[in-house]
């Protein structure tokens, strides 16, 4: 109740509660964006955002003895996953639809990152839109136009979507991308 500056809800046992507030912080987090690509539901295809996602991937790596990975995306999370997988001895390819690695960085700042990735044997395929992911047994193939990349696992690390339904239900204004609008 924004007018009364009170949060109303129910506890786990079903009893109601009301908590008054002077200022309210809504920190409901975000979920991984799951691209609308055929094959995202195949075994060995993951999204990644949090520790539990990392644990699922680690478990998969142990069970399958993976050697090759394709990561969809070239942002911070994709680069963190790339570093971890390369350190574990996997060959890694990165794919994304728009040209440029870390496009929000100045080109001169992104250049050494690209060079380091190339030195570590990482395949960089920017400018390729993934059409689908297919499976032949345990082997996955990422299809992007005329490009076909083989992998034991595929990780979508293309960003997050804000969990703003509570704010929306409370009548708060949402901003670009569905995040909660702020006064700052």
Where are the predicted features?
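Short glycine-/small-residue-rich Rossmann-like dinucleotide-binding loops
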Residues: 11, 25, 29-30, 155, ...
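Core beta-strand elements of the Rossmann-like FAD/NAD(P) dinucleotide-binding domain
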Residues: 14-23, 144-153
């Amino acid at each position: 109740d924004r007018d009364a500056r009170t949060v109303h809800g129910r506890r786990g046992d079903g009893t109601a509660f009301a908590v008054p507030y002077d200022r309210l912080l809504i920190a409901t987090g975000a979920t991984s964006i799951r691209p609308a690509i055929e094959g995202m539901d195949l075994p060995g295809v993951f999204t990644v955002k949090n520790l539990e996602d990392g644990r699922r991937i680690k478990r998969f790596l142990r069970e399958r003895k993976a050697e090759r990975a394709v990561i969809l995306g070239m942002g911070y999370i994709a680069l963190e996953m790339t570093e971890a997988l390369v350190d574990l001895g996997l060959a890694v390819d990165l794919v994304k639809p728009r040209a440029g690695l870390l496009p929000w960085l100045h080109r001169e700042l992104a250049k050494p990152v690209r060079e380091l990735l190339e030195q570590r044997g990482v395949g960089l395929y920017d400018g390729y839109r993934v059409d689908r992911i297919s499976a032949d047994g345990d082997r996955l193939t990422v299809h992007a136009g005329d490009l076909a990349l083989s992998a034991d696992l595929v990780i979508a690390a293309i960003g997050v979507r804000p969990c703003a339904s509570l704010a929306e239900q409370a009548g708060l204004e949402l901003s670009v991308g569905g995040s909660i609008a702020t006064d700052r």
